[in-house]
Amino acid sequence: MKAVAGEDGTLKPGYEAAPLRTVDPAKRMKENRMEPIPYTGDKGYKLGDVLDKKVTMEEFVAQLSDDDLICMFRGEGMCSPKVTPGTAAAFGGLTPELQEFGIPASCCTDGPSGLRFDCGTKAFSMPNGTLLGCTFDLPLVEDLYEMAGREMRQNRVDALLGPGMNIHRNPLNGRNFEYISEDPYLTGWISAV
């Protein structure tokens, strides 16, 4: 539905066809699928060796078993003792085997309205995604997340879960307060800062 000028100049409801997807997502995924990295077993490489350019990331990852990869990405739930207390989840180097490879444990916290801790730690509360979208103020949003980044660093938090980029009024969504707007253009711009 959109506004259309009538013969007398007043606006009336009008309609236009909704755009249809022109990309086949399954085809695109198949075309961009990476080749599997063959398993080599432990060659003695550490994650720091990738940073020092002694080995490639592919050579490093080739040492990890399927179980290692599953443990790294499955992670642990709320309030893991291996990371900052009260955070939403831990992931990465949570097992002794992964730690031997030099992979650190990392954590994330819920963040649609700032950092959240479940242990009594105080944190700055930010406007949720919808309110940020209502400002149309990119420099303001950038300043807010600059501050959130500092707070994350101070509290040893590696990732912030939110705000979200789903579009309001999409039938697949479920957490509208986290989303920035029903306008995909505005959502993209606010998210990019």
Regions found by a protein language model. Name each.
Residues 1-193:
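Glycoside hydrolase catalytic-domain context in secreted enzymes
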